[in-house]
Amino acid sequence: MAKKSMIAKQQRTPKFAVRAYTRCSVCGRPHSVYRDFGLCRVCLRKMANEGLLPGVRKASW
C-alpha cells in the first residue's frame, strides 16, 4: 500500500504537466499501471481471477 501522503500529493495538479503519473486506483501502486483499467498488474490479476472484471479472461493458446 502506498502512503496516504503520497496518494494525496499525487492527486494535486503538478506544477509541470510532465510530472503527472498514474497510480493504481485500488492499492496506490505507482508502477506497472494499466491505463485501460486504472489498476496495477497485481490488482488486475487478482480481480480478473476473481471474475470482477467483465470481459477479461486468461489467455490460452
UniProtKB/Swiss-Prot annotation:
**Cofactors, names only:** Zn(2+)
Against Pfam families, the record matches this protein to: Ribosomal_S14
Citing just one GO molecular function, the answer is: structural constituent of ribosome
Question: Per its UniProt record, what InterPro entries does this chain match?
Answer: Ribosomal_uS14, Ribosomal_uS14_bact, Ribosomal_uS14_CS, Ribosomal_uS14_sf
Q: Which residues form a coiled coil?
A: none
Output the GO biological process annotations, alphabetical, semicolon-separated: translation
Alphabetical keyword list: Metal-binding, Ribonucleoprotein, Ribosomal protein, RNA-binding, rRNA-binding, Zinc
Cofactor binding annotation = Binds 1 zinc ion per subunit.
Q: Which residues bind Zn(2+)?
A: 24, 27, 40, 43
Which GO cellular component terms, listed alphabetically, does the Swiss-Prot or TrEMBL entry include?
A: cytoplasm; small ribosomal subunit
Of which family is this protein a member? Belongs to the universal ribosomal protein uS14 family. Zinc-binding uS14 subfamily.
Described function: Binds 16S rRNA, required for the assembly of 30S particles and may also be responsible for determining the conformation of the 16S rRNA at the A site.
Assembly description: Part of the 30S ribosomal subunit. Contacts proteins S3 and S10.
Q: Cross-referenced NCBIfam families, in alphabetical order?
A: PRK08061.1
**UniProt-recorded name of the protein:** Small ribosomal subunit protein uS14
